[in-house]
């Protein structure tokens, strides 16, 4: 689905600026967010890792320092991403209930609002031309699954809305773990290694393969 632009520009980024109070550097926050998530090698990265990377890059921009902007401490979120492989809202919600950390709570509120906005705004988006026909052909010779770092709820909604969910055996989102873990769960040990094919549009897809 050609949804990355609308999701990142209209749902993720505005909430990134709002929740982390980046209004006085909004121009640079937007540039950095879009670079991180759309126009660089980290395109398609998990949303929480994207927050960490965006703040890392913002910390290197002189425009940010010139405006006296103090960036938030990402230590707590970074620690969680290093210890948890299922980087989704359910795991973060459980972690938040255990640690009583304001920065973790903020990341969770931001992520939940992003999901709300996506559900409200992103609909009626058809798959790329030729996808249905390709899936029909693929199903004649292969078992197909969805491998993504998008929440499962959004993935299932998009695939069902367009009537193509029946072409895949599993719809795996961020709640199932990393893309590498998705592939391992679904294919490794079940199919010869030279019969497993990962198709994607981001460096993270290549890395997972």
Range-by-range predicted roles:
Residues 140-146, 168-170, 194-197:
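Short active-site oxyanion
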Residues 165-178:
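A short, structured active-site edge motif that brings together acidic residues
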Residues 9, 152-153, 177-180, 203:
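Alpha-helix N-cap/helix-start and coil->helix boundary motif
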Residues 21, 163-166, 190-191:
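Short helix-capping segments at alpha-helix termini
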Residues 180-206:
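Conserved Lys-Pro-Asp/Glu-containing loop-to-beta segment of HAD-superfamily phosphomonoesterases
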Residues 2-148, 153-156:
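Alpha-helical substrate-recognition element adjacent to the catalytic core
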């Amino acid at each position: 689905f050609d949804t990355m632009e609308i999701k990142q520009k209209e749902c993720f980024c505005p909430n990134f600026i709002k929740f982390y109070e980046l209004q006085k550097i909004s121009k640079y926050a937007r540039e950095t967010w879009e670079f991180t998530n759309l126009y660089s090698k980290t395109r398609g990265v998990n949303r929480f890792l994207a927050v960490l990377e965006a703040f890392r890059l913002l910390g290197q921009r002189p425009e940010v320092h010139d405006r006296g902007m103090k960036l938030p401490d990402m230590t707590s979120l970074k620690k969680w991403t290093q210890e948890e492989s299922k980087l989704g809202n359910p795991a973060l919600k459980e972690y938040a209930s255990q640690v009583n950390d304001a920065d973790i709570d903020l990341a969770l509120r931001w992520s939940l609002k992003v999901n709300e906005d996506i559900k409200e705004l992103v609909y009626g988006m058809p798959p790329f031309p030729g996808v249905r026909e390709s899936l029909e052909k693929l199903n004649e010779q292969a078992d197909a699954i969805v491998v993504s770092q998008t929440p499962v709820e959004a993935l299932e909604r998009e695939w069902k809305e367009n009537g193509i969910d029946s072409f895949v055996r599993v719809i795996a989102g961020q709640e199932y773990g990393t893309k590498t873990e998705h592939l391992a769960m679904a294919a490794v040990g079940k199919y010869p290694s030279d019969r497993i094919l990962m198709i994607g549009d981001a460096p993270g897809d290549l890395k997972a393969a």
